[in-house]
């Protein structure tokens, strides 16, 4: 089980690592994949299945070899029939971090930031497990109009590419509203997540 302090520290570390990558690849788009899982346990078979499906889906779109994890329908295989892909590999860098505070994956692509966001939103919206993935696309300091060395990145919002905000897993309200109001119980969310995983995996 992860404490709140551990979770907050992991978020700070993630932001710091994003800054490091933005400094290293100032003219590219940075993608950060995490898993949305309720409760204090952030690393288990569910989170890893979702994470590796996300890694495979991102590699399928932008290029690369994927996670190598075998799932029935391979999650990304289900998605690959519908996903739009770039015609050649645009992946400059990728990294996976399997942490107790939650799986993290980073991808640097030489695709314009708004196009990268559009492609990542396609994964979130059409992949069988996409609603359990949080795929952030971050502008580099140069892409944000800042100077290299400023140590800042800025996320691209869905509204910038004309998409509505993400919807709740259990109802049609904006997910943010349900999270703030604690509209649904953790048990309800976990049951929904389990049913989504059981629909496409061997677990």
Language model features with spans:
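General detector of N-terminal leader/presequence modules that precede the first folded domain
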Residues: 1-64, 90
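Short beta-strand/turn micro-motifs at beta-sheet edges
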Residues: 18-22, 95, 157-158
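A cross-taxon signal for low-complexity, glycine/charged-rich
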Residues: 68-70, 87-89, 145, 151
């Amino acid at each position: 089980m992860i404490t709140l302090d551990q979770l907050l520290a992991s978020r700070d570390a993630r932001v710091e690592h994003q800054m490091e990558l933005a400094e290293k690849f100032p003219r590219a788009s940075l993608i950060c994949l995490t898993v949305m899982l309720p409760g204090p346990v952030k690393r288990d078979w569910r989170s890893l299945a979702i994470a590796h499906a996300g890694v495979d889906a991102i590699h399928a779109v932008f290029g690369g070899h994927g996670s190598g994890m075998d799932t029935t329908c391979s999650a990304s295989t289900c998605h690959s029939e519908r996903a739009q892909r770039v015609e050649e590999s645009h992946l400059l860098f990728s990294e996976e971090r399997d942490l107790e505070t939650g799986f993290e994956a980073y991808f640097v692509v030489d695709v314009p930031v708004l196009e990268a966001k559009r492609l990542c939103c396609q994964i979130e919206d059409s992949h069988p497990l996409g609603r359990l993935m949080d795929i952030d696309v971050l502008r580099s300091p140069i892409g944000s109009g800042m100077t290299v060395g400023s140590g800042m990145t800025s996320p691209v919002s869905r509204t910038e590419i004309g998409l509505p905000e993400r919807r709740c897993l259990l109802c049609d309200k904006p997910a943010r509203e349900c999270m703030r109001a604690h509209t649904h119980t953790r048990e309800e969310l976990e049951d929904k997540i389990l049913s989504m995983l059981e629909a496409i995996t061997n677990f």
